Amino acid sequence: MTLTFVSQSQSLVHPCLWASAADKAQITSNMVSYPWASSIYVQLKSRVDPKKDAHKLNPETIISAIPALTGTDRTGHTDLLNTAAESAILYYLTDNNDYAQLAADILSNYTDKLALAVDTTSKGKAYFFGDWWRESRITYPRIPIIYDFVYNFVNNPNNTVYDLAIHGRKKFNNTTAQTTVKKLAVHDMKSITAPNCNHSVLAGNGALLNILMIDNDVVRESYFSRYYNDPSNKLPFDAFKWTLANFSTQNIWPETISYSKMTQEIVLQAMNIIDRIKPELNIVNNNLRVLDGCYKYADFYFPSGAAIRYGDSHRDIDRIAIYQRILAIATRKNLPEYIAKAKQVLKYEYSLIGGYKPVVITDPLEWYGPLELLWGANIANSITAVHEPIHSTVRIEHAGIVLQRNNNTTDSVNYGLMYFTGGATYVHAHATGIEMELYGNGNVLGVNNGTGDYDPAIHTDYEIRHAAGNTVIVNSSAKRGDTSVWNDIMKKVTLDASEPAPDEAAISKDFLFSSQTLNDTYNNCLQQRTVGMIRTSDKSGYYLDVFRSKSYGTNNYHDYIYHNIGDTVTMKFANNAVVPLTSSARYTTDITSSVSGWKYFSKVISSMATTDGVNALFSLNTVKKYMNVFMPSGVSREYSTAVAPPTYEAESNYYKKNTPVMTIRQYGEAWDRPFICAFEPSIGTNPTVKSVEQLMNGTKVVGAKVISIVNGITITDWVISQEAANMTYTNIAEAITFTGRFGVVRTSVQNGKTKVSLYIGNGSSLQFNDSVLIANSKNNGLKSFDVVGTAIQVNTTSKLRISPTITSGKITINAGNNEQVKYAIFSLTGICLKNGKAINNTIIDLSQFPNGTYFAQLNDDSQSISQKFILKK
């Protein structure tokens, strides 16, 4: 039987932090009823029982293993405190005093020593357990949890604890225990060296749990106010109210994905604890957006299950624990909608790993393992598994990231398409310019380097630098802000346009695009990156990267850098001749105070300048997968290949190998002559893309004509990518006129039949021969139709015509023998300027309109035609 002892100066009833006496019935019922709960219980017993039994025979066996305090054996402390914590939990569940005794004896020897301990200072950082930063996350939380679960046991005058100093038993010293929890709480909050970031959250439970174990109500409230409000504003520790307010407008923590998700999960744990102890704050109901935002993370994963990676982040990021926290909170607070959604999503996540089979371990950092039992809720077999919502276009606002995916395939893992571009300043940001990652054939192929163990040399001089990502460096300048303050690492990349817009539905199963701009004042340049993601079949597609870049000063040269996991990278001209590459000293040095990171490139070989088209092939020989890169002719460039350091967490074991790199150097500006690369992932060495030609609008390069052959079908895409939505591209030879930022004309020819697709991603109008597509109110549109014949010609047989096609003010309606037709006159932006009814030879006066290009649309009962004409007064 559990006895409750409450001091006269406090109102808390123990246990209270992770679980209460009232919670016990449901927890033990779960242990009896459900395999997942009974499994956790059995695992806890198997881990603790041998130690419990040994301790009963000889207490000094375990107690004598406590490392020195203060000292550096953090692992030894963690193992012992974890044993005590698990034993304390088992005492709570079973009322077996042997578990309580083991936990209490370990606790007492720690609290007696810590109450007297003076922290050790090394390199300006104070610590008790060997690491000022990690101990606040590992050891500090375990001590109050042990204390809470055995509080009534140790304060029962009938019980004693074993004291190694006297080699005998004594009464538990609650005074030293109280001194310890206060000391740890204050030490935790004072040790934070990076305010206004996730550090106070990661260390926060070390402070919160110790504060909530302070007996005296007045003192506890004073400490809690410092944690929650910090009214003095003197602590480096971020008040929890600041933390809650710091979530982004998308309701996610504004750092890299792995730090964001982890931080948000810890915040949920703290919210649940605070709400248990201080319900009057109404912290859950007032901050439901923190729960809502957790589902956004599912949008940040490639089809293989690897997370996108920007800044100091990782690929393998589990989402189960964060959904378990939502379910725990929602169940305790009786929030039906949140309960239902969390259960459905968890059911889906469990299905991916063969069911929910929890494994008890000693958590190496953040400690939450026991909560799977204490806060766990069963998910019935009748619950329907539901994948978290994912979208075709996703914007990560704080990181300046836009990602797009095309899963219009029967096998999204192998044939799904997905990429991201962007960059910004946030905690743990890298200076990247407008970086990019590309997915294909089950792997993240186009990669940034990632982050390892923060080795000072390679992390500072490469991993966080431009050359570790896929970007463009201007005039060798790769400056960045001060990492130590995370205030202005780089300027934020802004989204100019995308189709679909973030979180909206795509209008096409084949075409998506985004365009982003960076005003890089650190490196005195303006850059714009437009990526079109083009699907050509269920199993094929490509990315068209159009990267514009110009210096605000002298345009000496621009370097386009692209990393792709693999074994080799080779280059050939478009005619299949090998590109001559010779050893080069390029990239061996950096400009002083402008570290790009490219000095980490090795085995650099470069070409002479050439205007010929060049194709690169990245080969993943062990898995027979490839990335084909097509760079059209027309602009003089120098091409290089190199070897970069291994890419962290690269799939298919390529994290063990150096990373192949391709670079392109272009002298002069790269704005009117942007870099254009078509990337096609393929299984096998026969890509579907056969040729890529740049599209010209006067002297400007504005996209590419891409010809693919897929299953015997010849697909021709005119992918038009202009710098702004008000610009007009005219191609007389191909009978194309487009006003807009991004558009595609596609013809697919097979067996004498031509399919045509007209796509406006962002713009106002697109004409191909007689067909005109006018954008909708969202400035996009899609039109598809079939034409008999292998080629498309201007419709010269129709009796519906206007003339002349160049007029000084008047046009004539040619309607043949029709008695009456309907007509409408449109501007290039799709605005209807004039409409009505006409008969053959009706003259329409347009002299009131300004010079320019217009469309006339004519309709009778049997047909509809659109015809372009020019008004030139």
Predicted regions and their residues:
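Non-catalytic terminal regions with compositionally biased, polar/charged low complexity
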Residues: I664-T790
